[in-house]
Amino acid sequence: LRPEEIASRIPDGATVALAASGIFLEADAILEAVERRFLETGHPRDLTVVHALGIGDGADSGLNRLAYEGLVRKVVGGHWSWSPRMQKLARENLIAAYSFPGGAISSLLREIGAGRPGLITHVGLGTFADPRVDGGRCNSRADEELVELCEFLCVLEGRERHP
């Protein structure tokens, strides 16, 4: 498929997961096609973008291609440094912005790809990602609870063990 065809298949309100690091493995031709389609037609709009690592060159490529009010509604990212325009949207409260550990996001994407319902991990407890702290929220527009604290009862050798 050509980048334009891929961009045309992204519906309004879709969740798009991106996998790259800086400019390495960046699907810039596809991101450019999505940007061009939005600027020409106003679609797709209200996307949720998920990325584990920083994507782009810090100027025009990567997540910066998606940094338009209306194109993106929510970003869940592990590293925002390479996308100053997306950072600006988050700072101005024009998108819901969340940040979680990059490894946890990568593992979550693997779980989703395998058809499993989510990720259970201790990573992030006691940090900004902990639901008892900020729950990964970076601004006031980020009003959803994307993570939750779970407690488990372990039964080993017929006896209950509490962590």
Language model segments and positions:
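Conserved alpha/beta enzyme-core scaffold
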Residues: 1-163
